[in-house]
């Protein structure tokens, strides 16, 4: 799989908030960690603090959980 920084990818992890959404690869860690690919999304998830418009718009995935969009 030829995933590189800046590539558009679709998320295939069923339990992810961003399942089947498209995001942009922000970075790839080559040190051997379990989820080396950081993906950035346009929308935020539901983990914002009560009363604020915020949340997380990045998450780590393994290459097996991604497909090029």
Curated annotation (Swiss-Prot):
Gene3D superfamilies: 2.30.30.50
Keywords: Membrane, Photosynthesis, Photosystem I, Thylakoid
Membrane topology note: Peripheral membrane protein
Biological role: Stabilizes the interaction between PsaC and the PSI core, assists the docking of the ferredoxin to PSI and interacts with ferredoxin-NADP oxidoreductase.
NCBIfam families registered for this protein in UniProt: PRK02749.1
InterPro entries associated with the record: Elect_transpt_acc-like_dom_sf, PSI_PsaE
GO biological process: photosynthesis
Keyword Isomerase: no
Name of this protein: Photosystem I reaction center subunit IV
Cell location: Cellular thylakoid membrane
Family (UniProt): Belongs to the PsaE family.
Main location per the UniProt record: membrane
GO CC field: photosystem I reaction center; plasma membrane-derived thylakoid membrane
Keyword Methyltransferase listed: no
Species this chain originates from: Parasynechococcus marenigrum (strain WH8102)
Highest taxon listed in the record's lineage: Bacteria
């Amino acid at each position: 799989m030829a995933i590189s920084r800046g590539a558009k990818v679709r998320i295939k992890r069923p339990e992810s908030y961003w399942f089947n959404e498209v995001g942009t690869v922000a970075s790839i860690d080559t040190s051997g960690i379990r989820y080396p690919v950081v993906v950035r999304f346009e929308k935020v998830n539901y983990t914002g603090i009560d009363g604020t418009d915020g949340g997380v718009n990045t998450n780590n995935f393994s290459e097996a959980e991604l497909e090029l969009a």
